[in-house]
Amino acid sequence: MTSTGDPRGRTDGLGWVSRAVFGDDRIGLTVDGAPPAGHRVLARYTVVPSVERARFLLPRGATRATAAALLAYNALRPPKIRAVRAGLGALARIGVLDAARFPTLTVSLPADVDPAGALLAAHLAELLGVRPAYAACGIRPPDPHHKPTLQVFAADGRPLGYAKIGWNDATRALVTAECAALRALPQASGVDGHPVTPRLLAELTWAGQVVAVVEPLPLAVRGVPVDDPPRIGALLAVARRGGAPAAPRPLAGSTFLARLTTEAARAAAADDTMATATAGSGVEQSGTSRAGGGERAGARAVEAVAALARRHGDTAVEFGHWHGDWVPWNLGRHAGNLVAWDWEHSGPDVPLGFDLAHDAFQRALVLDGQPAGAAAAAVDAHLAAHGAALGLSAAGRRLVADAYLVEMWLRTWRLAAGGAGWNPALHPALLDVVEKRHSG
């Protein structure tokens, strides 16, 4: 095989993941080559299937850990991906992957450098108290919305933890938010209908990145069907953190409306600089636009929030927490309980019903490939069918739908402002939808 240079200089998925996982400049990385002079080898990874089409970094020399990296939680994956991972996992279990002619990534450090102070995987092994520990990582095309995640396993294949890496402003904010949510959830987890949630094991600042180390899910967890009906009890428990209902309050004067107003004003102030901020992210973006996404989008958001207040200011609803990304692919079942993960968009003080609205919106947008307007109509239909079970009146359901759509556009703006670029499925289409609803 031909030796190649340090993959951190690449612009593809392998380069993106390598920069995130091996960010310390003291780390030597070589593909099918010897480490730099004076370095000692700390780890080797199999690059599957090739450098140019890399999809996995799998640890070498630990067949059970490598197999577990491919097979753990496979029941949660779509059938085609499940089949590929099952085949590779079977090969890993009998040691064939290590013997196959896949490229090998060698990780090294100068002899006098403590691995736990430079290598994230070594630091995680020390933090989790298991040595040796082995890390694996999936690879996808570079995307400023996504976070490389290290899966850490013991030599016997036991999952020890998952480390999400926030590497730009947008993803650092998401990882920080998930850490805050997980710190607050243990008392409610599994109580009075609240879904079971993985524990936060640690929050780290590492090589300029923010890292959330999260407890593994139960190995026997199974996904919920994509057509699973709303779990009203769980939605109420999440909103109330397992506690009692809060008294309804009008939208006018709420801290929720105040936050939307502040965020829209920030978006308006950034109208003239957004294109420069997004273009400066330094990542070849996938599924996002590097441009500012339309003139005066922030000013339009200011008017959208004002119109929301005019239209619904007197309507009273219960406010509470939300998961923030309540969709079938973030939910599972284990031992008779609902399990929920990926809490990075969670937050307090939103109208009760936001998670129900989000579920409908994302099913239509992601699963059915519908445009933003059709996804908004799906929100209306879902709330009409199930909102009463949450205690929402007809006026409350209309408030929740309209407020949720504004919230979603502001989320889209926050990600773009953090360097993730505009999501073309949501901008400018979602602003157009909001304006049309408010003018109707």
Could you tell me what each predicted segment is?
Residues 127-155:
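ATP-binding glycine-rich phosphate-binding loop
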Residues 147-152, 310-354:
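Active-site acidic catalytic loop and adjacent metal/ATP-binding pocket
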Residues 209-219:
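Conserved short submotifs of the Hanks-type protein kinase catalytic core
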Residues 181-192, 218-263, 302-316, 324:
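Conserved kinase catalytic-core helix
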Residues 199-208:
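Short beta-strand micro-motifs within the conserved protein kinase catalytic domain, predominantly
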Residues 150-177:
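ATP-binding glycine-rich loop module of kinase domains
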Residues 354-391, 405-418:
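Active-site activation/catalytic loop segments of kinase-like enzymes and analogous catalytic loops
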Residues 70-138:
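Juxta-kinase regulatory segment immediately upstream of eukaryotic protein kinase catalytic domains
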